[in-house]
């Protein structure tokens, strides 16, 4: 079943010059297509919409601060089982626990600065795509 998902290449991926490598890995996998790509710096409103469910948790403020620290690359990726697949390609949130061959396993350093965000379900993908690409949903 074809799906769409949101992928964010976080400020650490942009700062470290890894966006091209990560995008190449996504494009090479399973015939997925990148149908939208945008470089942007996230404002407070967008970050609150995206991470609002975590407000009040100890990691919320540092996460929002990190995500506002530099530009991100936002992508819409489409293809068969793309939601599950991109998350597998990214690897676990903690780069130390991520296997070699995954994006975080190969390039990740710490949990908060873990290079990539990918929607975790069809519902999340739909909600997140409306935030980042409102004209494409």
UniProtKB/Swiss-Prot annotation:
- Catalyzed reactions per annotation: a 2'-deoxyribonucleoside 5'-diphosphate + ATP = a 2'-deoxyribonucleoside 5'-triphosphate + ADP; a ribonucleoside 5'-diphosphate + ATP = a ribonucleoside 5'-triphosphate + ADP
Compartments where found = Cytoplasm
Mind listing the GO molecular function terms for this protein? ATP binding; metal ion binding; nucleoside diphosphate kinase activity
Kindly list the positions annotated as binding ATP: 10, 59, 87, 93, 104, 114
EC number, UniProt record: 2.7.4.6
> Could you say which cofactors this protein requires?
Mg(2+)
Give the protein name, as stated in the record.
Nucleoside diphosphate kinase
Q: Which organism is it from?
A: Streptomyces avermitilis (strain ATCC 31267 / DSM 46492 / JCM 5070 / NBRC 14893 / NCIMB 12804 / NRRL 8165 / MA-4680)
Write the lineage as a comma-separated list: Bacteria, Bacillati, Actinomycetota, Actinomycetes, Kitasatosporales
Q: Which gene encodes it?
A: ndk
